[in-house]
């Protein structure tokens, strides 16, 4: 599911919650070739991951084809539609004439009876007015006027009797009691055509709100060259759904200078009239900032599960006790993580099995003098009873004073012994993450093999 679709769903969800309405989900699957089971599942998975749950059972549009045809028959009886028997060759010739004359296509069957065409293939077209204008009152764009002379007689039913998108959405929105339609502004022209269908049936036209497109950082239409576009990609890249909701809400809408807000705040503040009409530009740095905020706020147990899944996906099998180790380490290493992938990288060192392999750079830090100093530090650490960050920081500072050196003289080597050269937090954080027995054991493996 494209992030533009995700933002549209989010704005619908926010507006429904804000107004006490219902957030409805309909799968518009009249295009049978594109509407595969996999494509539909992507929509369900994306909405589930984002936490946007529909208030009623999803409706599948194609299953309502009989109802759509019923409405077409009603339009035919009212004189608001007609059967068009033009052959493909005749239609192409009319298109050429229309282009040459600067007008829309008009079928000769618009005001003609079937004559001797009975039995020939036909489509059913809407009989659009040829004069005047159609007004679309839009909550984002304002009043948009369409000259009826520029609106063609759109097809309602294809030659095989299947309904077209523009017909189906009108019928379904009416039957489902939809009062507000919030969607991308690539549908703005459709709003005029759909308004004519509503009017042809004597139905109330819903309130329209057409959202501007999402552009890349350079102002161009968002494309693959700008990076990820699908919700699933952002999930795989380690973004949290609450961060995505917060970020997507800011793409075209905002509340003063507030950058970070809860779902409850967004629901209380959101009004579709406050959406700007200009395209929104993505800013990946802002998304990373938000994701870091939500990672720092998240329940460590939840992060442990998510990070554990990442480790498993990397063929790093978790053993008994690893979850507890991760949960202890995560609060100490998460502050700098912009994504869950970075958080997983930051916890690799706590899952390593002894004896650790040492990188060449890590080995280079362990000269004879440094080894001797770390042995002395190891004995002092063994005597620490309160294995917490504050106590360990104090002990490391005191040790440096006793040695008459700065922490930089032994800190990098200590971190290398504890992590094998893998990324690790500050010294006290690494020690607490590993726990006392594991920390001392790793020191012994390098400094006193066989101890």
Where are these regions (language model features)?
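A generic structural signal for well-ordered alpha-helical surface patches
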Residues: 41, 192, 264, 375, ...
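An alpha-helix initiation/capping motif
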Residues: 33, 37, 41, 62-69, ...
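C-terminal accessory/binding modules appended to enzymatic or scaffolding proteins
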Residues: 361-422
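Catalytic adenosine-cofactor/nucleotide-binding cores of aminoacyl-tRNA synthetases and other
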Residues: 189, 201-358, 419-451
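Glycine- and acidic
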Residues: 25-29, 176-181, 229, 395-397, ...
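N-terminal Rossmann-like or analogous alpha/beta NTP/dinucleotide-binding catalytic cores
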Residues: 1-100, 189-203, 243
């Amino acid at each position: 599911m494209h992030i533009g679709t995700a933002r549209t769903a989010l704005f619908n969800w926010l507006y429904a919650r804000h107004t006490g309405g219902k957030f409805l989900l309909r799968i518009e699957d009249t295009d049978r070739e594109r509407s595969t089971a996999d494509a539909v599942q992507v929509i369900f998975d994306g909405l589930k991951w984002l936490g946007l749950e529909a208030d009623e059972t999803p409706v599948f549009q194609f299953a309502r084809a009989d109802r759509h045809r019923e409405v077409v028959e009603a339009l035919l009886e009212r004189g608001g539609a007609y059967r068009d028997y033009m052959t493909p060759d005749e239609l192409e010739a009319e298109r050429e004439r229309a282009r040459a004359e600067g007008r829309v296509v008009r079928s000769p069957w618009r005001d003609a009876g079937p004559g001797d065409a009975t039995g020939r293939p036909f489509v059913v077209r809407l009989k659009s007015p040829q004069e005047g204008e159609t007004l679309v009152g839009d909550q984002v764009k304002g009043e948009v006027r369409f000259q009826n002379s520029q609106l063609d007689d759109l097809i309602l039913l294809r030659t095989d009797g299947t309904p077209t998108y523009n017909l189906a959405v009108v019928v379904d929105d009416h039957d489902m009691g939809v009062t507000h339609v919030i969607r991308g502004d690539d549908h703005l022209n459709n709003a005029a055509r759909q308004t004519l269908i509503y009017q042809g049936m004597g139905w109330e036209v819903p309130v329209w709100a057409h959202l501007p497109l999402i552009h890349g950082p350079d102002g161009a239409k968002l494309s693959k060259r700008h990076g990820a576009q699908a919700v699933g990609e952002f999930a795989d890249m380690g973004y949290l759904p609450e961060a995505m909701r917060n970020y997507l809400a800011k793409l075209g809408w905002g509340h003063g200078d507030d950058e970070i807000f809860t779902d409850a705040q967004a629901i209380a503040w959101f009004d579709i009239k406050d959406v700007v009409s200009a395209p929104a530009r993505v800013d990946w740095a802002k998304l990373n900032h938000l994701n870091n905020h939500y990672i720092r706020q998240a329940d460590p147990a939840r992060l442990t599960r998510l990070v554990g899944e990442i480790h498993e996906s990397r063929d790093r099998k978790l053993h008994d006790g690893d979850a507890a180790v991760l949960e202890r380490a995560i609060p100490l290493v998460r502050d700098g993580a912009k994504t869950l992938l970075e958080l997983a990288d930051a916890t690799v060192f706590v899952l390593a099995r002894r004896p650790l392999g040492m990188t060449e750079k890590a080995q280079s830090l362990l000269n004879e003098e440094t080894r001797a100093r770390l042995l002395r530090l190891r004995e002092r650490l063994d005597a620490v009873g309160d294995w917490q960050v504050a106590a360990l920081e104090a002990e490391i500072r005191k040790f440096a004073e006793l040695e008459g050196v700065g922490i930089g003289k032994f800190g990098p080597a200590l971190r290398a012994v504890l992590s094998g050269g893998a990324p690790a937090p500050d010294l006290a954080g690494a020690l607490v993450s590993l726990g006392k027995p594991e920390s001392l054991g790793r020191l012994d493996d390098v400094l006193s093999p066989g101890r």
